[in-house]
Structures are given as structure tokens and as C-alpha cells.
Swiss-Prot record:
<protein>
    <recommendedName>
        <fullName>Glycogen synthase</fullName>
        <ecNumber>2.4.1.21</ecNumber>
    </recommendedName>
</protein>
<feature type="binding site">
    <location>
        <position position="15"/>
    </location>
    <ligand>
        <name>ADP-alpha-D-glucose</name>
    </ligand>
</feature>
<dbReference type="GO" id="GO:0005978">
    <property type="term" value="P:glycogen biosynthetic process"/>
</dbReference>
<comment type="pathway">
    <text>Glycan biosynthesis; glycogen biosynthesis.</text>
</comment>
<keyword id="KW-0328">Glycosyltransferase</keyword>
<comment type="similarity">
    <text>Belongs to the glycosyltransferase 1 family. Bacterial/plant glycogen synthase subfamily.</text>
</comment>
<dbReference type="Pfam" id="PF00534">
    <property type="entry name" value="Glycos_transf_1"/>
</dbReference>
<dbReference type="InterPro" id="IPR011835">
    <property type="entry name" value="GS/SS"/>
</dbReference>
<dbReference type="GO" id="GO:0009011">
    <property type="term" value="F:alpha-1,4-glucan glucosyltransferase (ADP-glucose donor) activity"/>
</dbReference>
<keyword id="KW-0808">Transferase</keyword>
<comment type="function">
    <text>Synthesizes alpha-1,4-glucan chains using ADP-glucose.</text>
</comment>
<keyword id="KW-0320">Glycogen biosynthesis</keyword>
<dbReference type="InterPro" id="IPR013534">
    <property type="entry name" value="Starch_synth_cat_dom"/>
</dbReference>
<dbReference type="Pfam" id="PF08323">
    <property type="entry name" value="Glyco_transf_5"/>
</dbReference>
<dbReference type="GO" id="GO:0004373">
    <property type="term" value="F:alpha-1,4-glucan glucosyltransferase (UDP-glucose donor) activity"/>
</dbReference>
<dbReference type="InterPro" id="IPR001296">
    <property type="entry name" value="Glyco_trans_1"/>
</dbReference>
Length: 484
């Protein structure tokens, strides 16, 4: 099967969030299943020079953005049995950040059409075009409404994966004609219109032959008003064509047995080496070197979505009452950055905050932590808890989205489970759950059993890739056009 990924970011080239991890790992996993896989993404200025030097110019064309014709260069490189095509346009992609610009609607209207035009130019006649989030959701719509009428595209099917429904690509009505080049009758509640605006995510949802989300629980949650971000009725209409598939992690990159970033490699049969990583982390962060003190960590975007309101309400009291250490790595909203700076000042012997992102340090934190805190308000899938499980840092999470699907609460009677969970989004329950985890940490035989259970499970992309393969095969067998 020929599969074309259309993504706005992709590791190892450029990353702002978890979407890049999926776009980096899933194509490789599908290629290992015998598929012919290509990935198209913008050639951002942020891509490191060593990667740019490996790119070879393949072709160029022009792409319509409304009434204008814009240059589109197509550069190519192959890596891990995947063909990568980089869409080059200095005006749109030579910016100081990937997103957050006044003309993001224009940038990704261009990119969406460029994907389809470039596919023909370089002869990537895919069976499946797999798009991700609002940035490429318009590819699904343009394919259905316009390109499918041409022989090259007539057999192409499309799948949209929703990574985070909160971000939808919402723009003024004139985007319909001025940027997308579509007649204004497309600006209609059964098509692009949502609450008086053009909504790229909605366009993808209604036009894709199938929609996936990044966990089964998140799939069910977004059908409800609380999580549906005003698109729950659209999703309910497509309910039979929406599937939740858990993300995996790249277990060659996140692998404690061979991780070059950590002090001592280890596995579930050699947990003494995990303690070496804990000592090294304490040294690096300037914390007292005490192996018997539980070290709790967070590697996260510092935002309300990640449950940091709850953390802020209980952390002062917890650090005063408990003999623990806390290490935080991340950037985000100023109020939370300032809070963790304050916490480090107020509890200098117990707390350290690295405001920024450092990939080697992230690995060292996973390897050196005893527990990993992730009390998200909502979490479509979450990669942090999967990496933590892989490294034997036991997750403490709220039961939502992919956290509910991947972290099983420890049951003392049966001796089962790989973490600690709570349901209601409130600070009291979070504090109680942390205290419960701390009580089991004191029982070292029990704790080692929990750690081994966590580390011995398979969090790779193998199983998930097979589920995507099944969806793709199902879609290609179907002759139904969802917009008919």
C-alpha cells in the first residue's frame, strides 16, 4: 500500500509538540509492515543544517492561493525506508516560529494545496493520504471536493488524525475564496462554516474517509459537549467512521537499555542502575544526593491543560509535609513558569525547575525519577506517561483520554497495575493519590514489582501501526464518498 503523510512537523527534523513524534515514528512503523511511505512537510528555517544539506531538489511548481500563484519547491531525502518531501517557500516557512503568525490561515491553505500538487509532480500516487490536525485537514477537503475529479487522484482516499481538538484553524469567511480558491457556497454549515468562521478541522472531519483520534477514550470524550470544542455534533454525525488508536513511542529513541543520554543503561532486571541515574540527576540539578527519598518529576508544557492549577494548589503543602524531591522541565504560560521558579526558591533543598527544554535532560529526568506527575485536565493521548513507564518512572495521572487507556491503577489486593490514578479534577484527589503512591514507595518489594510491571509492557508503535494498517485497508476497499 502507498501511504502519503501530510504533516506540519515531524521528528527528527522539526518539533513543537507530540504531533511531531507521531509523524516521525508512525511512518517508519508502517514502512516496516511493507508499505511504501512518503511524508510531506514544510521546509522550515528551523530545520537543522545537517538535514538541509542532505535534501536534494526534486522539482518545482506553482500553487494557487486564491487568485495568486505561489512558488513551491520540492526537496527530497530518504531515511529509514521513508521518503521525505519538503515543501519549500521562503515567504511562508522562513519564520521565527512554526505557528502563531497572523497569516497562518494563508500559510496552511498554501501547504494543503501544495501537498496535493506536489504529489502529482513527484508521482506519489498514494492509496491513502493521512493528514494530522487542522494544519493539513484541508487536504482532505480539497481532495474530496476538487482533486478527486482528476484521474491522478481519483482513487486516493484520506484519513484525518485528531491529535488535539482544541486547535481547529479558525479563520474569517473570505478565506474560502481568497485563499482556498473555492466558491462561497462552500461557506455553509454543512461544509466549511462553523459559528460564522471557516474551520479547517471541521473541513477535514466531514471530508475524510475515516477519522482517527490518538486514544480510544479521547475518541469517546470528544463526542460530548465538555470535550467536543463545539464540534461534537459534527463528530457524532461521523461517529461510525471515527476510531481511537493509541499512540506508541519510538522505542529506539526512548530505550533505557541503550539511551546515550543517561548515566547508566538499564532494564527491568537491573534496577540498581536506575539508582545511578537518580544520583546523577540529583547532582546535575543540585539536589541532595539521597537515594531513599522519592523523586517526582514533570516534563510538560506548563499550561492549564496539563493540570498545573491543581499542582500549584497542593505542591507547597506537599513539599512542607513530605520528604520528597520535585524536578520540573518545561516552558509555557508565564504564571506557571513563575510559580515553579518561586517553588525552587522557597524549597531549595527539595525542588528544581528548568524553564526551557533540553532533550538529553528530559531523558535523564525520566531515567532518574521514581514517579512522574501528569494530572491533565484533558489529554488526547499523552506521550509523557508512556516514556515514563518505559523508564520505570511510575505515573500519577488523572483518568482522562490516553492516560486512562495506558495507566492502570495499582490494586494492592491483586498486586496489579502500573501507576496511580484519580478521576475528579480537583486538588484534594491529586494530593491523596500522590500520598498513596508515596506509601507504596516505602514498601520497596511492592514498588519494584510495580516498576517491573511498567517496564515490561510494550509501548512501541508495532501494535498501533497494525491498527492504522487495518483502517487504511478498510478505507481503500470502500467505494463510498462521505460528502455525497
Amino acid at each position: 500500500m502507498k501511504i502519503l503523510f501530510a504533516v506540519s512537523e515531524c521528528t527528527p527534523f522539526v518539533k513543537s509538540g507530540g504531533l511531531a513524534d507521531v509523524a516521525g515514528a508512525l511512518p517508519k512503523a508502517l514502512a516496516r509492515l511493507g508499505n511504501e511511505v512518503a511524508v510531506m512537510l514544510p521546509k522550515y528555517s528551523q530545520i537543522p543544517e545537517p538535514w538541509k544539506k542532505r535534501m536534494k531538489k526534486q522539482a518545482e511548481c506553482t500553487v494557487a492561493v486564491g487568485w495568486r500563484q505561489q512558488y513551491c519547491g520540492i526537496e527530497h531525502m530518504a531515511e529509514n525506508d521513508v521518503n521525505y518531501y519538503f515543501i519549500d517557500n521562503e515567504y511562508y516557512f522562513n519564520r521565527d516560529s512554526l505557528y502563531g503568525h497572523y497569516d497562518d490561515g494563508e500559510r496552511f491553505a498554501f501547504f494543503s494545496r501544495a501537498v496535493l500538487e506536489a504529489a502529482k509532480v513527484v508521482n506519489v500516487q498514494a492509496d491513502i493520504v493521512h493528514t494530522h490536525d487542522w494544519h493539513t485537514a484541508m487536504v482532505n477537503y480539497l481532495l474530496k471536493e476538487e482533486y478527486r475529479k482528476h484521474p491522478f487522484y481519483e482513487r486516493m482516499k484520506s484519513v484525518l488524525t485528531i491529535h488535539n481538538l482544541q486547535f481547529q484553524g479558525i479563520f474569517p469567511p473570505d478565506v474560502t475564496h481568497d485563499l482556498l480558491g473555492l466558491e462561497m457556497d462552500h461557506f455553509h454549515y454543512e461544509r466549511l462554516e462553523c459559528n460564522g468562521f471557516v474551520n479547517f478541522m471541521k473541513a477535514g472531519i466531514i471530508a475524510a474517509d475515516h477519522v482517527t483520534t490518538v486514544s480510544p477514550t479521547y475518541r469517546n470524550e470528544i463526542m460530548t459537549p465538555y470535550y467536543g470544542e463545539q464540534l461534537e455534533q459534527v463528530l457524532q454525525y461521523r461517529e461510525d467512521d471515527v476510531t481511537g488508536i493509541l499512540n506508541g513511542i519510538d522505542d529506539t529513541f526512548y530505550q533505557p537499555k541503550s539511551d546515550p543520554y543517561i548515566e547508566a543503561q538499564y532494564d527491568s532486571g537491573d534496577l540498581a542502575c536506575k539508582l545511578e541515574n537518580k544520583t546523577k540527576l540529583q547532582q546535575r540539578m543540585g539536589l541532595p544526593e539521597k537515594n531513599d527519598i522519592p523523586l517526582i518529576s514533570m516534563v510538560t508544557r506548563l499550561t492549564k491543560q496539563k493540570g498545573l492549577d491543581l499542582v500549584r494548589r497542593i505542591m507547597h503543602e506537599l513539599l512542607e509535609e513530605q520528604d520528597i524531591q520535585l524536578v520540573v522541565l518545561g516552558t509555557g504560560e508565564r504564571e506557571f513558569e513563575d510559580y515553579f521558579r518561586y517553588a525552587e526558591f522557597a524549597f531549595h533543598e527539595k525542588c528544581r525547575a528548568y524553564i526551557g527544554f533540553d532533550e538529553p535532560l528530559a531523558h535523564q529526568i525520566y531515567a532518574g525519577s521514581d514517579m512522574f506527575l501528569m494530572p491533565s485536565k484533558f489529554e488526547p493521548c499523552g506521550l509523557g506517561q508512556l516514556i515514563a513507564l518505559q523508564y520505570g518512572a511510575i505515573p500519577i495521572v488523572r483518568e482522562t483520554g490516553g492516560l486512562y487507556d495506558t495507566v492502570r491503577a495499582y490494586q494492592e489486593e491483586e498486586g496489579t497495575g502500573n501507576g496511580f490514578t484519580f478521576s475528579a479534577f480537583n486538588a484534594h484527589d491529586l494530593k491523596f493519590t500522590i500520598e498513596r503512591a508515596l506509601s507504596f514507595y516505602c514498601q520497596q518489594d511492592v514498588w519494584k514489582s510495580i516498576v517491573k510491571t511498567a517496564m515490561n509492557a510494550d509501548y512501541s508503535w508495532g501494535k498501533s501501526a497494525k491498527e492504522y494498517q487495518r483502517i487504511f485497508e478498510q478505507v481503500t476497499r470502500s467505494g463510498r464518498d462521505v460528502l455525497e
